[in-house]
A protein has these predicted regions:
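Transmembrane-helix motifs of polytopic, lipid-linked glycan transferases
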Residues: 108-131, 169, 173
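Short acidic/glycine- and proline-prone juxtamembrane loop motifs at membrane-interface regions
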Residues: 149-163
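Extracytosolic helix-loop segments that constitute the early lumenal/periplasmic catalytic or substrate-binding loops
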Residues: 38-42, 52-83, 90
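Short helix- or helix-capping micro-motifs
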Residues: 31-34, 140-145, 193, 197
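Membrane-interface transmembrane helices that cradle and orient dolichyl/undecaprenyl
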Residues: 129-135, 170-186, 196, 306
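Short periplasmic/luminal acceptor-recognition loop of GT-C membrane glycosyltransferases, typified by
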Residues: 407, 417-464, 472, 477-487
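Transmembrane-lumen/periplasm boundary regions of multi-pass, lipid-linked membrane glycan transferases
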Residues: 54-65, 206-311, 322-334, 387-389, ...
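Transmembrane alpha-helical segments
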Residues: 38-39, 204, 355, 360, ...
């Protein structure tokens, strides 16, 4: 039986008519989602951040070096091929195929994130409509369509919107299987969740709501069901094979995104979990950015109301699981990497949609408020929500944000290096973004991508004269001090700067950064030798 339009415990609500008329819900939500992305969209920032430039670099390497799917390559792999341990490179591979069809153009990097973001809006609507009713679905879809972090991440090349989309789609299809026992839902639901885990290993958190749905279907005897074990096998077999392969790439080539070993690991440490500031900052980001204040209030209202049966608690279990996942990925969350908190949007929006109708019903029952024109109610709530959303988007995506300014400076440095260095040459990029040991950091890829050069990354704290000479012997032709680091470098490393200036020709000394030609002796790089 199709229960998408039946009442599943949602409070009665008599206005406005748009919420009750499902016919045009999906086109309206798609229109709102597209409009929100157009409002936030900036072509020069589609490929801009660390993760975006890494993904675009891998896509370029597929496009240029052959479509060898199992061997993703980064630009910062030194003088080697740059094969890297990472999540399954589905997105950069598809982007490379788009490059093959249409040429290398930045706007192509929008296709997958935008499609995933809009797809998530539709999925949340259908899911919420199915478990509650069309009115809840529409409000949940509206909250998803205008969610500040989802809008921001789906207008740039990030893997998180596709991961969250496929995870939500998979759970929705598995709910359909639980109710109907149709194997098409089973297979496609398992496939969607497999893709989510391939895109990001952290999507393993979906296992808890999946286990809950199996419990709804089979009760305490779920362990005896062959379907449950088959579901687990179908979901996990490809991710296991991929991540085993990815780890072999790390062991051989020593490049990693920090997903399994080496690099910066985002997982919790005792220090982070015992820090009260972690919880305060994370809660603040969730209230003011991922939800916005009004949505957070109705989310709390929605999650506190009891439901009529076990299946209705799917969103509750999903939301609580995401909160537990924040603790698992606490180190990444603590640094303000808001993409780690994106999975809260779908279950949060669904419960907030339910809570919104509860709130409106309660307000409608107050005699002094019931006399207000219904259009006034709708306008007041819409303005309150819109205000919180616009403020959140402005604050967190402002050009004055530290990371935005840092990435902008890296882009300027990279473009300058691309102009001044020989194509195909190897570079050494030095900055102060990373200060830990080499095997415990992320590698900033921006300068490599925007210069279209390969090479090595060195944190300024590691820099020595011997290390510079070692990289030169390994093939480095140029050394770059990024625009973000010039002032600190000149203040903290005058001896190394003097060494470089005495031995090598400076090709750049400006607000775009410092650039030295590491050809042997100053006579090795006269002005006539410099690239135009």
């Amino acid at each position: 039986m199709d229960r998408s339009d039946t009442n599943r415990g949602t409070p009665l609500f008599t206005f406005p008519l748009l919420l009750q008329t499902a016919k045009h819900h999906i086109p309206i939500l798609i229109g709102i989602a597209v409009a929100a992305r157009l409002a936030m969209f900036r072509l020069d920032e589609v490929i801009f951040s660390w993760r975006s430039t890494d993904m675009a670099s891998i896509a370029l390497n597929y496009y240029r070096n052959g479509f060898h799917f199992l061997y993703p390559q980064v630009f910062w792999g030194g003088n080697g091929p740059g094969y890297v341990e990472m999540e399954c490179p589905i997105i950069p591979f598809l982007l490379a195929l788009l490059y093959r069809l249409f040429g290398v153009q930045d706007w192509l990097a929008l296709v997958i994130p935008v499609t995933s973001g809009v797809g998530l809006v539709v999925t949340v609507y259908l899911f919420s409509r199915h478990l509650f009713d069309p009115a809840v679905g529409f409000v949940a879809g509206l909250f998803t369509a205008t969610s500040p972090p989802l809008v921001a991440l789906s207008t740039a090349l990030w893997p998180d919107p596709p991961m969250v989309f496929f995870g939500a789609l998979g759970l929705y299809l598995i709910v359909q299987w639980v109710e109907t026992n149709k194997w098409g839902y089973f297979v496609f639901g398992a496939s969607a969740i497999t893709i989510a885990i391939l895109l990001k290993l952290t999507a393993l958190y979906l296992g808890i709501p999946l286990l809950y749905l199996c419990y709804v279907k089979y009760g305490s005897g779920l362990w005896k069901s062959a379907s449950v074990w088959l579901l687990a096998f179908l979901i996990l077999i490809l991710p296991c094979l991929w991540y085993i392969h990815a780890h072999t790439l790390y062991r051989e080539y020593h490049n990693t995104f920090g997903i399994l070993s080496g690099g910066f690991l985002k997982f919790a440490t005792a220090e982070v979990l015992l820090d009260p500031g972690f919880y305060g900052k994370s809660l603040g980001r969730m209230i003011f950015y991922h939800f916005t204040p009004l949505v957070f209030v109705v989310f709390i209202l929605g999650i506190m109301v009891s439901q009529r049966d076990r299946l209705h608690y799917t969103f509750h279990v999903w939301a609580v699981t995401v909160l537990l996942y924040f603790l698992v990925a606490a180190r990444g969350v603590s640094l303000g990497h808001f993409q780690y908190m994106l999975p809260v949007v779908p279950p949060g929006a669904a419960l907030a949609g339910y809570g919104t109708l509860l709130l409106l019903r309660k307000l409608e029952s107050v005699p002094s408020l019931a006399r207000w024109p219904k259009g006034t109610w709708a306008l007041a709530l819409a303005l309150l929500y819109l205000g919180g959303t616009v403020v959140a988007a402005h604050v967190y995506q402002s050009p004055e944000m530290y990371t935005t300014k840092m990435w902008a400076h890296d882009k300027r440095t990279g473009l300058a290096v691309g102009r001044l260095t020989a194509p195909g040459s190897l570079i050494v990029v030095v900055d102060n973004q990373m200060g830990g040991p080499p095997d415990g950091i992320m590698t900033p890829p921006n300068v490599f991508y925007f210069s279209d050069r390969r090479g090595w990354y060195l944190a300024m704290s590691w820099l020595t004269e011997d290390l510079i000479e070692q990289k030169r012997r390994e093939g480095a032709r140029y050394l770059v001090i990024t625009a973000n680091t010039v002032a600190t470098f000149e203040e903290s490393c005058p001896q190394i700067q003097g060494y470089l200036t005495a031995r090598y020709v400076p090709l750049l000394d400006s607000e775009e950064g410092l650039l030295y030609d590491l050809a042997p002796g100053k006579e090795g790089a006269t002005k006539s030798d410099r690239p135009n």
